[in-house]
Amino acid sequence: SLEGTWLGDMHIVSYWGGVKYKVTESEITFRPYGYNSTRGDGYWVDFYSGCSWDYVAYHIKWEVYDREIIVDFIEDGYRMYISDFIINKSYFEGYIDVDRGESLKFNLRKISNPYRNWDYYDYGWGYWDSYAKGAISEDFSTVGDSTQSKTAAQTQDKPIRMVME
C-alpha cells in the first residue's frame, strides 16, 4: 500500500536566485483518509547538499485516479503525476511527470509506516524507527510554514521545483 514514508531520488531540481540545485533525496509520507482509501494527505520533504538550506518541506494532498497518483503541493500549487507504478511492502517505483511531457523513472524504499509497529523485512519482530519518528517529526510542527529557514523564507521566495531534464 502507498501508506507510510518513502525515501529515494525523485529527480527533482530547484531554481533559486537563478541557481540550479539538485535534490539529493526526497522523503514522502502518504497518509490515507481511511482504510484502503485512494486519497489522502501527507508531507514531501526534499533534502539538499551544498546549499544554504538542508531541506524544504511541503504539505501534500494525493489521489489515485485512473491508474496514476496525482500529488498536489499545498504551499506552492505544484502538481506531479506518478504513473506506471509498482508498490510492495518495501519498494515503490514508477515514473514521475510534471507537465505531461517526458517522464523519469524513480525508485523509493519504505522507511516507516506510522500505523504499524514492525519492520518491513519479514523478520516479524518489532522495532522503533528512530529516524522517521525522531529526526523527522511526523507532524512537522518545527517546519512551520514548510520552508527550510525562517530567515530565507522572510527574505526570498521558495525555490522553484521541477523534474530534472
Describe the function of each predicted region:
Residues 12, 65-165:
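Beta-sheet ligand-binding and adhesion/scaffold domains
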Residues 7, 31, 109:
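Residue-level detector of conserved, well-ordered beta-strand and adjacent loop positions
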Residues 18-68, 158:
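N-terminal glycine/threonine-rich, aromatic-flanked beta-hairpin/loop signature
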Residues 14-16:
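Structural motif
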Residues 6, 22-26, 135:
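Extracellular/luminal Pro/Thr/Ser-rich low-complexity repeat and linker "mucin-like" segments
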Residues 8, 40-42, 94:
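Small side chains
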Residues 1-9:
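N-terminal helix-cap/turn-to-beta initiation motif at the start of protein domains
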